[in-house]
Amino acid sequence: MRFQVALLLLSVAVARALPPVYKRDADSGDSQNPPNQPSKQSSTPLPPESSNQVKTTRPTDGQGQKSDKKDQDKTTLAAVSSKAESGPPTAATDHSLGDSRRQPEKTDAELKETARPLSPVNPKLEKSDQSSTEDSGKPTGGNSGKPTGGDSGKPTGGDSDKPTEAGSNKATEDDSGKSTKVDLDKPTSKIFPDTETSKTDKVQPTEKGQKATLTSKTESGETLAGDSDFSLKPEKGDKSSEPTEDVETKEIEEGDTEPEEGSPLEEENEKVSGPSSSENQEGTLTDSMKNEKDDLYKDSSGNTSAESSHFFAYLVTAAVLVAVLYIAYHNKRKIIAFALEGKRSKVTRRPKASDYQRLNLKL
């Protein structure tokens, strides 16, 4: 609040100090431009996209809000100062024109900075903004520059906001209406086939039930001959089912009685199994003892067999030696003659022809 009050005081001081400058600008502007042009410029200081972007930046950027508040405060103070002073209307209009010209420049600079991160605006909102700006431009054109700076600044802020909100609301209502209409149309179209399918489903089980009864009856061996037969056959089927149920109950009763009779038998079996189990244990002990004895016998027999095998080996070798010695003893003369004959043959060798030739050469 203090900051706003200080801005108000500064704007009032500037407005009082600069009226002659605006008069000169007004004289030059009136000579160059007709009276309708400034009203159009003041009426449309912002393009439609800029108004939308300013709206989008207001909830997010605190700096944009402060700048907009400053501009609005300046315009309102200029309007109040122009009304308070009894000067000509041209000065007020020129002052409003100057403020309105400054506003687009500031807003354009701000929009260029904010337009980069922002996403594109919806086309429906752009159309509604254009229509609102055109509506705001019409009354200023008719008044030919008479409205003050406050009037020229208002359509940019409040009037442009209201139609856009109304247009957006209308668009949302139209969209919601269309969606509801489409949704209402769709379920109605879907409900009918569902009901038909449910009807067909209801009919099918009855048909299946009839077919099942027919097949069961045909399996029982009965012939189908008409409606009267259908009414009679269930009775026959009931009669045939009753004896089967009686037979099943009898079997169940017999099955129940059998375990009762079998219970004492089980006790006897347990009694018999008791001594038999003890006998089996004794039998296993005796078998183990027999197995141990057999192992001992096998060991002893193995040892004896090994000893006997060695004994037989010794006997065989001794017999062979005795036989050799016996033969050698009886044939000792022949053996000695054979051994000595070899020596004799070497000494008593007959001379050869080579030996005679050598003797002849020597002589």
Swiss-Prot record:
Residues 330-363 are cytoplasmic. Residues 139-156 have a biased composition (Gly residues). It holds the Pfam family KCT2. Residues 29-59, 274-288 have a biased composition (Polar residues). The modification Phosphoserine is found at S42, S220, S277. The keyword Glycoprotein applies. Residues 133-188 are annotated as: 7 X 8 AA tandem repeats. Residues 253-269 have a biased composition (Acidic residues). It comes from the Eukaryota. Widely expressed. Residues 23-302 are annotated as: Disordered. It is a single-pass type I membrane protein. A motif (Endocytosis signal) lies at residues 356-359. Residues 96-115, 171-188, 196-210, 230-252, 289-298 have a biased composition (Basic and acidic residues). Glycans are attached at N303. Disulfide bonds: none annotated. GO terms for cellular component: Golgi apparatus; plasma membrane; trans-Golgi network; trans-Golgi network transport vesicle. Coiled coil: none annotated. Residues 1-17 form the signal peptide. The chain crosses the membrane at residues 309-329. Its main location: membrane. It is found in: Cell membrane; Golgi apparatus, trans-Golgi network membrane. Residues 18-308 are extracellular. May be involved in regulating membrane traffic to and from trans-Golgi network. Not found in strains BALB/c, C57BL/6 and DBA/2. This is Trans-Golgi network integral membrane protein 2. It comes from Mus musculus. The lineage of its organism: Eukaryota, Metazoa, Chordata, Craniata, Vertebrata.
